[in-house]
Amino acid sequence: MTLLTQSSTWQALSAHSKNVPHMRELFATDAARFNKMSLSACGLLLDYSKNKATAETLDLLFTLASNSQLEAKIKAMFAGEIINTTEKRAVLHTALRSTAEQSIIAEGQDIVPEVQQTLNKMQGFVSSVTSGQWKGYTGKAITDIVSIGIGGSFLGPKIVSQALRPYWNPELKCHFVANVDGTSISEKLKLLDPETTLFIMSSKSFGTQETLTNTLTAREWFLAKGGLQSDVAKHFVAVTSNIAKATDFGIDADNIFPMWDWVGGRYSLWSAIGLPIALLIGMDNFRALLSGAHQMDEHFANAPLTENMPVIMGLLSLWYGNFFNAQSHVVLTYDHYLRGLPAYFQQLDMESNGKSVTLNGTDVDYSTGPVIWGGEGTNGQHAYHQLLHQGTALIPADFIMPLQSHNPIGEHHDQLASNCFGQTQALMQGRTFDEALAELANSALSATEKQLIAKHKVMPGNKPSNTLLMDKLTPSTLGALIALYEHRTFVQGAIWDINSFDQWGVELGKDLGNDVLARIGATQDCDALDASSNALINLYRQGKI
């Protein structure tokens, strides 16, 4: 057993988990439960009253957090200590949304001035493009942006841009390319005019396989359509640490934006990686996005554990994963603009906490990161919600909804909200056999049939959920929401004593992919790998099965 599972608090939580009353009873015996188990911060309201938790549960979870030195670990992250120990890096995505007045030291120097300089450079670039001052090689203004990246360099900008669609500049369109599948970029290029298209290449090394391949294809298309190599600088910019490679490609050094080792890819949308966002919504709105995240940073860093929104959400998720064998967590967004958030949170959580050894290399003997999945309401109610209500697995849920719609048409939003709240109520209370039987009382079914159908209509309830509300989806509230999930992820990793900031599984896939690529291009059939891999590679070389 690890020190964590040997601890008296862990053992107490394990025993306590078997004795928590049904939520129906918890609500019936405490009319003030919502008031006691809801919290407002940074433009968000968290209702966590529909959880399998009592005051004793929360006390034990907060004790577990304290005994795991959570507060000290939070301070260490914000202070720029080397908490990504396997890569010997600080973790300072929070510095990207700091104020100009702050001082944050990384590797012996204050990094805030460089962050502010980059924001100012972004401001000038965005102004140049959106005003029409930036011209393509034929003198036309830019109408289309193509963001080329992968992982955090792709998903963050895409999902945030999608979420903030009401704030877009109507004169610009943005297209996102990530997959190395040639179909992805080919379909995008069919829509574009090379004279008015600007490509943003985002890769720290300027060598990420998928990103470089897509960028080279974009340049070939640009040159084939009439552009010259000398025109590349008017249509390609880069976010990278490798200035030499970017300039060799044809990008003007003045149009290269920096990346830093102390920012992980899945936490990078707040940096120049967010340039596509800034172009679409403007720098004022981009700064509002940063400001909302900064407010959540301040809340996370300073609020006591018992009143700390990311801490509470992280602890409750851990509670279900480690003491109720919950293997997944569903995120349900009741706002069409937020439909991409489950995929973003999936990458954030699963890449961060999909680990199986502690910081000192000991194998864990407890579950770590769950599978994160989800979708938008009300679509899911006609699909996978069935499993949430009557399936055998316990799947905690997060419901996210703005109180006000950007498109208040008729009763649409009233119906959306009623479905959202109704789902949380149904998951909590369920339906008993007697209730199901009573509903069938006036039906034409026989007594035997009623008994049978009633059994099928029983729902156990006691299914946990959080509800997150905001007045309206704005850059600021979106920033706070994303930062909330970042810090929630950190909380769990800190208690599990794992490194939430490396991704060696991703790196292994890259290494083996490059090896396979070389074998695909070889002159002889492959026979050096396992039988399955040899066969698959050789079938691919033949081009038929």
Swiss-Prot record:
Report the catalytic activity.
alpha-D-glucose 6-phosphate = beta-D-fructose 6-phosphate
The pathway noted for it is:
Carbohydrate biosynthesis; gluconeogenesis; Carbohydrate degradation; glycolysis; D-glyceraldehyde 3-phosphate and glycerone phosphate from D-glucose: step 2/4
Q: Which InterPro entries match?
A: G6P_Isomerase (IPR001672), G6P_Isomerase_C (IPR023096), Phosphoglucose_isomerase_CS (IPR018189), SIS_dom_sf (IPR046348), SIS_PGI_1 (IPR035476), SIS_PGI_2 (IPR035482)
Q: What does this protein do?
A: Catalyzes the reversible isomerization of glucose-6-phosphate to fructose-6-phosphate.
This protein is called Glucose-6-phosphate isomerase
Q: Which gene encodes it?
A: pgi
Q: Which one of the record's GO molecular function terms can you name?
A: glucose-6-phosphate isomerase activity
Q: Which SUPFAM superfamilies match?
A: SIS domain
Keywords associated with the record: Cytoplasm, Gluconeogenesis, Glycolysis, Isomerase
Which family does the record assign? Belongs to the GPI family.
Q: What is its EC number?
A: 5.3.1.9
Subcellular localization(s) per the UniProt record? Cytoplasm
Q: Name one GO biological process term.
A: glycolytic process
